[in-house]
Amino acid sequence: MNPREFISNLPDEILGKILSLLPTKLGVSTSVLSKRWRNLILLVDNFDLEDSSTSGFSAFLEQTVARLNTCPIKRLSLNGRHYRFSSADSWISTAFERGCLELHLQSQYLDTGILSSNTLVKLTLSDQIYLQGLVPHDGTVFFPALKTLSLGAVVADRDVYESLISGCPVLDELSIRDGCDDPPTWKKSVVNKSVKRLTVSFHHPMSAWAYEDNVWFKTQSLVFLDYSAFVSQGYTIVDRMDSLVEARLDLRLWVSTDSYDSDYEDKDFDVYRPYDVFGDVTSLVSGIRKVKTLHLSPDSLEAFFFCCNHMPVFNNLRNLSLESDEEKGWQALPLLLNNSLNLHTLSIKGLVHRVTSRCGDACACISERKTGMCCLSACRIKVLEITGYGGSFIELKQMRHFLGKLQCLETVRIGVERDGNNEHLRANLSSLHRASSECNIQFI
């Protein structure tokens, strides 16, 4: 049986599924093959419409919609910045009328009047979509069944933007990405009672004015938070995030902290003391204090130290994951360890960090005679995970410090870099003194 006969012998339902996987323009073109293929297009429920040219795209879509006026639509992906404003609204409305479950839109303009569907469960609005229309009333429900909402750099009035987020009463996952060269579009607030997973990326290094107001969160059902942005003036947590299980923070400072490393107790330091670091993350850090797993970027470690007036107690924290950078310090690490009494696992990607006078005794940057009681000695950490270990003198010194101070360690997992003499590195690490007799070193 040749391939052509094999395809022809497939059931209509299977051929319809195959056509749904093709770009819609290609799938529609098969209707010229025969009467059977002309009818098969009616089984397509997944439409991917894209064209970068101005000529023919609108006509093609209008003809397609007209031919498929009885077809159910499960998924619609619409990408075309050159078609008419009214045509796009018409196509989207048609998809909603036919029970569309998933909509991905990349266009120029969208009328807020059509943002209503009882069936839609996933919505993606890409960069530079302009939402236009009347401001919705308070309490307006746009999508009663929507579970996932993804917003690029969507341009809209504050009331429209915020109402779109709050108008999804069963929302599970919200993603906001705003970091292009154009002016900021995110309104720095998320208000939704049901959202469980929230991802925010807000990076505009040339628009410092956009960070001068507080960031608002009213997300009492939140379970997972991934927040990446330059630090703002402040943060307002309207309802406590008591349900939060995991948080990933990448909080970037606006200035280098090189000039802030001197000892504040130095009698001559006040003469040269630098200005306060912009931003206050105290409320944000306090808002996530019930978290069980916390991931911090190198910048976040510095933000926790310079922009947090009071470090809360993390009673529920079991897993702490850090990433190091040779230009960023570990100033906040002693505070975190002292306030995480039930910490079980400490994971660090890279041990090399900037040496400062503020790292405290969590690292080996300063001589032991200046530290007194080491914060590591009181830690109950049972698992230490180190990745990206290169075997340098500084790294070996830090490992000696960890193994010699952490008295409850049971397992140490070390990921050694591929370059270098691995056998020599392993031998050096295995020979280090261990404060815990139960400590077992594993190489991964």
Curated annotation (Swiss-Prot):
Tell me any Pfam family this protein matches: F-box
Q: Which InterPro entries match?
A: F-box-like_dom_sf, F-box_AtFBL13-like, F-box_dom, FBD, FBL60-like, LRR_FXL15/At3g58940/PEG3-like
Q: Which stretches are annotated as coiled coil? A: none
Q: Where is the F-box domain?
A: 4-50
At the top level, the lineage of the source is Eukaryota
Q: Which PANTHER family match?
A: BNACNNG35480D PROTEIN, RNI-LIKE SUPERFAMILY PROTEIN
From the Swiss-Prot or TrEMBL record, give the protein name: Putative F-box protein At1g64540
Q: Which organism is the protein's source?
A: Arabidopsis thaliana (Mouse-ear cress)
